[in-house]
Amino acid sequence: MKRLVSLSAEDNAATALSDISPGDECCLEVAGNKYKFNAEEGIPFGHKVALIDFQPGDQVIKYGEIIGRATKTIKKGSHLHIHNVVSDRVVK
């Protein structure tokens, strides 16, 4: 079973605490919310994992903050990165 970290009940993305291979079982409980799923694809250590299914335009929330929006349909257990999420952060 692979470990993930998430800090807020509002989060719909978690961080992988080790490399995750396709099909690996992942479990997480945060603030009473329980998640259990198999990884859809390989996810490197430190990268984001989808805790829910996303539709294009859905907000991606990590550590209680909106960090971006889905650019396509994303299945729970998928790698969240620049290929399927656009950042909401603005660099000044």
Label for each model-derived stretch:
Residues 2-33, 38:
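N-terminal first-folded block
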Residues 16, 20-26, 57, 64, ...:
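Conserved SET/PR-domain catalytic core that frames the SAM/AdoMet-binding pocket
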